[in-house]
From Swiss-Prot:
Molecular function via GO: ATP binding; GTP binding
Designated name of the protein: Nucleotide-binding protein Rsph17029_0317
Amino-acid positions noted as binding ATP in the UniProt annotation, renumbered to this chain: 15-22
Domain of life: Bacteria
Length: 302
């Protein structure tokens, strides 16, 4: 039996207001997607009734859409998933509630779900409304610590098929004190390794420095750990690719997000790149510190 050819590549882009959905839609348009924003949900099935337009389609959907509600969107996702002609992906552009409130207060815009109330009430209402949709997402990008440029770069790694034909891997370091980053597929705790913080000459350096990496690598537990980690990830990547996944996100945490997690993320990223996988590296806490010394207008969020 010959399986039907998938005629449509369709990306549904949603998420809370202020998280960066419009930036995402514009970025996808720059990549060659046919973009339609705020299309009523009831019109979406009609979009794929005709012949394929020959390029992928991105649809922006949020609470401002006519006839939008979480139940209807989930029903639409189920319907499209079952359509053999459609290759569907759901992109959820997320953001922490505190950052969304900060953005609304900064721009003095009214929240669409609370036009006569505080932004905080609207943000809370919308996050609750979208919770069932969030768990159905194929891709989740948390823009809480991202600039528009960061978001566009991340989307390019995930959705620009011309940029890469293999599964893209992102590795990031973080501090457990500031919480585990959202949207990460696998997390590894590096706090069992020797901590360079207690070595005065290394304290102010970070895990990108060779002296810090050498110190951490001298821990007797590091060698076996890193070898098993590398082998595990290299084993998983082809399997993830076969399942149709376009992106895998790996998180590495330690106490301060400065030494151990940074070094391990750097070393693994380099190992994966040497094996031929597209890799991006991000160090959340180091970026926070760098952003803190930049002028305000350069610290604009997504």
């Amino acid at each position: 039996m010959v399986e039907p050819v998938q005629e449509y590549r369709l990306v549904l882009v949603t998420g809370p207001s202020g998280a960066g959905r419009t930036t995402a839609i514009n970025a996808l348009e720059d990549m060659g997607y046919e973009v339609i924003d705020n299309l009523p949900l009831s019109f979406v099935p009609r979009l794929i009734e005709g012949p394929s337009i020959g390029r992928p389609i991105a649809l922006g959907l949020d609470v401002r859409n006519r006839d939008f509600n979480a139940t209807a969107l989930i029903e639409l996702i189920d319907r499209l998933t079952q359509d053999p002609r459609v290759a569907l992906e759901v992109l959820y552009v997320d953001c922490s509630a505190s950052e969304l409130i900060r953005r609304y207060n900064q721009t003095r815009r009214r929240h669409p779900l609370a036009p006569a109330e505080t932004p905080a009430e609207g943000v809370e209402r919308e996050i609750d409304l979208l919770a069932p949709v969030r768990v159905r997402a194929d891709h989740l990008i948390d823009t809480s610590e991202m600039s528009p440029h960061d978001l566009k770069a991340e989307l390019s790694r995930w959705f620009d098929r011309g940029a890469a034909t293999r599964l893209a891997v992102s590795v990031q370091s973080f501090s457990y004190k500031r919480g585990v980053p959202r949207g990460v597929d696998m997390i590894f705790d590096c706090r069992f390794l020797k901590n360079p913080y207690w070595v005065e000459s290394l304290r102010t350096l970070d895990g990108r420095e060779a002296s810090v990496a050498d110190y951490i690598s001298s821990d007797p537990r590091f060698g076996p750990f890193f070898e098993k980690l590398r082998d595990l990830v290299l084993f998983l990547l082809p399997a993830q690719l076969e399942e149709g996944k376009a992106h895998l996100s790996l998180g590495f945490g330690c106490t301060g997000g400065q030494h151990r997690s940074v070094a391990v993320a750097e070393l693994l990223g380099n190992a994966l790149a040497e094996a031929g996988w597209p890799v991006s590296k991000r160090h959340r806490e180091l970026e926070r510190r760098a952003a803190a010394v930049l002028p305000t207008h350069q610290g604009e969020k997504a």
